[in-house]
Curated annotation (Swiss-Prot):
InterPro entries xref list: ATP_synth_OSCP/delta_N_sf, ATPase_OSCP/d_CS, ATPase_OSCP/dsu
Record keyword Transport present: yes
Membrane topology reported for the UniProt record: Peripheral membrane protein
Keywords on record: ATP synthesis, Cell membrane, CF(1), Hydrogen ion transport, Ion transport, Membrane, Transport
Family: Belongs to the ATPase delta chain family.
Subcellular location: Cell membrane
Function: F(1)F(0) ATP synthase produces ATP from ADP in the presence of a proton or sodium gradient. F-type ATPases consist of two structural domains, F(1) containing the extramembraneous catalytic core and F(0) containing the membrane proton channel, linked together by a central stalk and a peripheral stalk. During catalysis, ATP synthesis in the catalytic domain of F(1) is coupled via a rotary mechanism of the central stalk subunits to proton translocation. This protein is part of the stalk that links CF(0) to CF(1). It either transmits conformational changes from CF(0) to CF(1) or is implicated in proton conduction.
Any single Gene Ontology cellular-component annotation: plasma membrane
TM helices/strands, residue ranges: none
Protein's name according to its UniProt entry: ATP synthase subunit delta
GO molecular function per UniProt: proton-transporting ATP synthase activity, rotational mechanism
High-level lineage: Bacteria, Pseudomonadati, Pseudomonadota, Alphaproteobacteria, Rickettsiales
Quaternary structure, from the entry: F-type ATPases have 2 components, F(1) - the catalytic core - and F(0) - the membrane proton channel. F(1) has five subunits: alpha(3), beta(3), gamma(1), delta(1), epsilon(1). F(0) has three main subunits: a(1), b(2) and c(10-14). The alpha and beta chains form an alternating ring which encloses part of the gamma chain. F(1) is attached to F(0) by a central stalk formed by the gamma and epsilon chains, while a peripheral stalk is formed by the delta and b chains.
Major subcellular site: membrane
Amino acid sequence: MKKTQYNNLVSSYARVLFHVSGSRLGIIRKEVEFLLAFFKDQRDVFVYLSHPMISFAHKKEVMLSINEHLSENLVKFIMVIFANKRSSLLILILEKFLSLARENENEFEITIKSAETLKESDIKIITESLSFLGKIIKVSNVVDPSILGGFVVRYGFNLIDASLKSYLDRLVDLSKMEILKVRNFV
């Protein structure tokens, strides 16, 4: 299966869980956060659950042992994933669901790429200027010397490029256009 097909499949399952959650979205969200943390701490459990040779009955048994922390709807949803032999995608589906839930609550994570590590005061200025978008729940500062200066902010599928590299690239493009104009008139 191609990567886009996997992404579509993951998104489809996540949207189903999102819509099924309805008025219980906050509760399901907390349970999904718990489950993801559990799988991160107990990696062996997820490896066991995602193994194709483990029977559906055994997977169901494991999920029912965790059931005291999960609502019936979430357990049933996970059982559908197991029945459809998509257990290896479970973590991706749950992460995508969290992304949809955050988007619904107007919460988002931002990544600030800069040529060097930013000071807290600089990060605060950037996050305050983006606060009109919603609640920023996580900020990551990634160092990339290739941007030369300035910064690039990514949130969701959006990008704000205030880097020196992109400015210089635009300047080069404008220069090329002007040279072509002059060449055409001569």
